[in-house]
Amino acid sequence: MSLPLRHALENVTSVDRILEDLLVRFIINCPNEDLSSVERELFHFEEASWFYTDFIKLMNPTLPSLKIKSFAQLIIKLCPLVWKWDIRVDEALQQFSKYKKSIPVRGAAIFNENLSKILLVQGTESDSWSFPRGKISKDENDIDCCIREVKEEIGFDLTDYIDDNQFIERNIQGKNYKIFLISGVSEVFNFKPQVRNEIDKIEWFDFKKISKTMYKSNIKYYLINSMMRPLSMWLRHQRQIKNEDQLKSYAEEQLKLLLGITKEEQIDPGRELLNMLHTAVQANSNNNAVSNGQVPSSQEHQHLKEQSGEHNQQKDQQSSFSSQQQPSIFPSLSEPFANNKNVIPPTMPMANVFMSNPQLFATMNGQPFAPFPFMLPLTNNSNSANPIPTPVPPNFNAPPNPMAFGVPNMHNLSGPAVSQPFSLPPAPLPRDSGYSSSSPGQLLDILNSKKPDSNVQSSKKPKLKILQRGTDLNSIKQNNNDETAHSNSQALLDLLKKPTSSQKTHASKPDTSFLPNDSVSGIQDAEYEDFESSSDEEVETARDERTSLNVDIGVNVMPSEKDSRRSQKEKPRSDANKTNLNASAESNSVEWGPGKSSPSTQSKQNSSVGMQNKYRQEIHIGDSDAYEVFESSSDEEDGKKLEELEQTQGNSKLISQDILKENNFQDGEVPHRDMPTESNKSINETVGLSSTTNTVKKVPKVKILKRGETFASLANDKKAFDSSSNVSSSKDLLQMLRNPISSTVSSNQQSPKSQHLSGDEEIMMMLKRNSVSKPQNSEENASTSSINDANASELLGMLKQKEKDITAPKQPYNVDSYSQKNPAKGLLNILKKNNSTGYPRTEGGPSSEMPTSMKRNDATNNQELDKNSTELLNYLKPKPLNDGYENISNKDSSHELLNILHGNKNSSTFNNNVYATDGYSLASDNNENSSNKLLNMLQNRSSAINEPNFDVRSNGTSGSNELLSILHRK
């Protein structure tokens, strides 16, 4: 039988018995580390005291109330072994109290939802009100300590409310207090402490009232007075944020109400995509009906009306895109698809204008144009495109693709090409919107009209600037009426200088005229995109650089303003003349005249030539394109104006050349003076006389305005160009053909790049390169030049007749028949006879030597030598550099060259020509044909600028073929 157990301490009245029980429970059996210090042992004494107060005294109310000090003294007195320290108990308790004050305290300042009230607690042993708080335990963080203490004292869990960044921290009497700020706690919560004899009261206090009556009322507060200011600031900030959020939400709601935006009107993106697909399917079904001829007559009439409205509308309109879809196809385009019911017609409204107007395609000949504002940048990787895309069978399992037909590539209309698929939805086109300044109707009017109205030209800024680079000689057929206004001498100079614009591309790029049409179209597509991406400022800079290059190419009779400005920076003329031939050969004959520019200027010239090559290659598409002829004529006009500007800069200030050369020195240079020849002086004397003959103004031509250019600026430039040049073309032609090539350049100075010069470049060097020879003790020989306008006119007529024959389809040449019909053809055929044999150069010393024997035995010399031809041949002979130049004939250059063109047209035996090594003295025979001598002289000039071992046959052509190719060049 078991005995009923009772509580050990129930009805116990002996204090010693109770103390013995507590001593065993809390002190004797504790770990040794907890007894290692006085403070740690007193913590166990404190826990035993709390147990006595919380439990034993409640069971035995008659027991005395014991504080920590009296309780510790009774324990030590009952068991002295537990106290092994040499310190008294009261002193140990004071030390223990100081230690407890150093322990950090963590608590919470709890506010209600309106931020108007704060929650405070009052302890059982204190009459002051403060935050719920507690001491941090060992290895416990701040957040966990705050949550634990608040839950013990008020029974509320702050896990979902606490923010580790919102707190107030203070140090009071060496004790750290960290109070976290909590808001949004409900006032209706039933707060109840979970510990005994620690919290007496829990109440909500009005924060505003506390802040006013803190120091006046009888209620005591702890920690609140020291934290009142930061609490007030935090509350103000929280109220402001709350008010701003409410204000923003209120304003948003009111704005939506004003705009009529409600949540019900918002469309789901998935639903919107589905609606778009349904619309596309419905459009495709309508297209099938149109292809089958089921469109009602009223709808067809509406389509035709819209089509005519788009063609006739000329002014710019800007309107937002309409949600309605344009008609998928016009009735005129449904015919190719009428027989095939499985074909979906194209749905691109942007191609309607081009498909319905085939003449526009024929006129433009596939030239690129700026896209319309409503067109998406669709890419087409096929080499050619068809104005009507290839039919694609429908796929009803997949969503329709209304954008499958991209922008047609109009470079080639030979065959169809499969369009690349494009998955974007179609861009809607406004029903009432017309095309802007790049309208096809306006473009067609420009192409068909030879002289459009100046007002129309000034109001548009076409983007077809890619075709304004280079010069096409075929465009002269469209401009014969305008060229008659030029003087005969000026037109002769222009005809002789035209090959220079196209022969530069021979060494760097292949001629695109021999390429297939597809290849040309691909090149134009890539270069058109590069050109459109470049700025107008770069294009204008390139044009200025080309102008400076043309100035250097001009005949060096008088120094230009550009050379005068750079007179302090150039090299001595003697040194420049020695090294200039190498510089010109290394740059692939880019700089024809004597090089005076700095290396930076030469690099700019090379870059400008590269840009010219890029755009010049794009114009060789077809000879019969009206659009290309129109653009080429404008470009030819620009080239002529630039040449006139060049001559104006060279003769704007008729200052004596000797005066300008006297101060043309650099630091460390010995002053010297170059003595000009009598030929240059005679030419300078004829400037005033010849300037009065070329005063006829040219008829203005059509000029496509560039981006950023206005008609007023174009008119000013035109006036400047019209009044630019009055220099005689006969003088320039004579100076061009007269300049000898120096033989002082040693063979080791020749650039290896000269071997890569094409035949065109060699002949152009012969005709246009300025003299770089160094006069040595030259004697002044007086001679004068007279003007013969009648001979120049006759020569101009023959050259124009020659050019017309060249532009015709090329046929096998018959020398006898052509020589009887056209004197210019006679000279060409005579030069062509010399094509059978080429002679390599040999090096015989420091200076370049010419071949010692050149024989031709293909015909007999049966005509006498013309006197005037002999005189012109003497001009063209290389002059001995040690004895000065030979005397020049008094005959006019145009008359002399005309006599050569009228000279013997039969083949003759070409005798040996012996050249002296030091001065290229030519031993001529009176029985030689003057035309053959002219050819030999030109070949000798060509050999003077090439490498010593350069063989003319290395390129497969001789000097005569090279000259013939220049005269035939387009």
UniProtKB/Swiss-Prot annotation:
Biased amino acid composition, Acidic residues: 526-539, 625-637
Biological process (GO), any one: deadenylation-dependent decapping of nuclear-transcribed mRNA
Naturally occurring in which organism (per UniProt): Saccharomyces cerevisiae (strain YJM789)
Top class in the EC scheme: hydrolase
Protein name: mRNA-decapping enzyme subunit 2
Subcellular location: Cytoplasm, P-body
GO molecular function: 5'-(N(7)-methylguanosine 5'-triphospho)-[mRNA] hydrolase activity; manganese ion binding; RNA binding
Keywords attached to this entry: Cytoplasm, Hydrolase, Manganese, Metal-binding, mRNA processing, Nonsense-mediated mRNA decay, Phosphoprotein, RNA-binding
